[in-house]
């Protein structure tokens, strides 16, 4: 998605050869116009998948998931990284390691909001080693639903996340695929659509 790649070039920063900072428009401050375009792009890419619901992970996945759900006219639900007093009963759970935060979270989702037999689109902000996306697919399947696809806003293609998802049979659509991170330069995988 050219608009997203341009935004990453303009406002993203490679903090190392592994870490891309996009807090100016995605995971701290959010650009609503860009999120709207992202929602439209995901809706277009998955228009034939008959999606019933979107599942994402708090917090950076919420904006792109909500805009996609709005565009597709379907509900979305986000998995929580920590249990609260109101999120206690009938949960599906998975452990997810965050490379960026260097910690493991036990993510959870209420079975009330992902129903058996539903076709679910998993959306996440980043794909690196695939931990978050795989954790979300585990939640969806534990609830008895089917993962119809995985939508990623920014993929670090030099890491193994895509391969792990594809090996498990998931369709992966990434809007921007980063090939390499270097100081003052971010390069992208050229994708022919």
Curated annotation (Swiss-Prot):
Amino-acid positions noted as binding xanthine in the UniProt annotation, renumbered to this chain: 20, 27, 156
Biological process according to GO: purine ribonucleoside salvage; xanthine metabolic process; XMP salvage
Top-level taxon: Bacteria
Annotated GO MF terms: xanthine phosphoribosyltransferase activity
This enzyme's EC code(s): 2.4.2.22
Assembly and oligomerization: Homodimer.
Function: Converts the preformed base xanthine, a product of nucleic acid breakdown, to xanthosine 5'-monophosphate (XMP), so it can be reused for RNA or DNA synthesis.
NCBIfam families in UniProt: PRK09219.1, XPRTase
Protein name as it appears in the record: Xanthine phosphoribosyltransferase
Organism, scientific name: Exiguobacterium sp. (strain ATCC BAA-1283 / AT1b)
């Amino acid at each position: 998605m050219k608009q997203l790649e341009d935004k990453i070039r303009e406002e993203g920063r490679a903090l190392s050869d592994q870490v891309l900072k996009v807090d100016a428009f995605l995971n701290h401050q959010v650009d609503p116009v860009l999120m709207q375009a992202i929602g439209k792009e995901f809706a277009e890419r998955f228009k034939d998948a008959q999606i019933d619901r979107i599942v994402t992970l708090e917090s950076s996945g919420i904006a792109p998931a909500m805009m996609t759900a709005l565009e597709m006219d379907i509900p979305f639900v986000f998995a929580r990284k920590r249990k609260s007093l109101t999120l206690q009963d009938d949960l599906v759970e998975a452990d997810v390691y965050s490379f960026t935060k260097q910690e493991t979270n036990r993510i959870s989702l209420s079975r009330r909001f992902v129903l058996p037999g539903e076709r679910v689109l998993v959306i996440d902000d980043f794909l690196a080693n695939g931990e978050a996306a795989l954790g979300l697919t585990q939640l969806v399947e534990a609830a008895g639903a089917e993962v119809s696809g995985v939508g990623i806003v920014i993929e670090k293609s030099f890491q193994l996340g895509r391969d792990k998802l594809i090996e498990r049979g998931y369709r992966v659509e990434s809007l921007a695929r980063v090939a390499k991170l270097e100081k003052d330069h971010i390069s992208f995988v050229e994708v022919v659509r």
